[in-house]
Amino acid sequence: MGIINTLNIEELKQQYRETGYVLVKNLLRDEVAQAAYEALKNRVPWEFHYREMNTGRVGVVNPADLERLTPREIKRLVPTMATLKDNDFSFAYCRYTIPSGAADCPEPVRILSDIFHYFNSDEYLGLLADITGDASGKEVSTWCSRYDRNHHLSVHMDESQSQTRIAAHVLALSKDWKQEWGGNFAFCNAESEPEIIVPPSFNSLMLFKVPRLHLVTQVESFVGESRYSLFGWYKVEKEYFHT
């Protein structure tokens, strides 16, 4: 099964070279994108992850406990969104770790493992090397995310002391998302104010050179839909993907 559509590599290379990022529309083949969306919406056993500013406390709520929590109880766990002026970092979103071994991946979410495998194929790593101009990448780490009401990812640079990250790699898989709902990706200026805002667009890949200031704005409290994505990094170290 083919995973992605044909890409205009020369055009993407030029844009990345000029701006430090590219937005690749319709990355996955239609049937693959639809299957991934269905898995994310209906099949994935989500965990809830959050980090409080000031205390730095990180919490994880497992899928069984998350199912038992009421919306009000979940809201109490969501921290206040940090800003650059706070000199701190906060987040709140649901996450699922894709097993790298297909045999370890339950059938209802097998399509996510298939995508993870393709992202780490020689073919795809070669495409990213061409686009970014950096062939040292050996892995595309990939997790699933779900942002619900009040969830956010505060301003940060994507720097890591333990990893050599070349580019952030985020594939949006939300349908009919509206910008006024929040949950928008944004590049920020030096004052941490959003200056380039990119609302989630189904089956669009955001690939950008790191480090770079960015965030995901808070999802508004009235929103009843979920924002889905596959996120990770094109990086040097091979840590998470094992065949």
Task: Name these PLM-found stretches.
Residues 1-205, 211-243:
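Fe(II)/2-oxoglutarate oxygenase catalytic core
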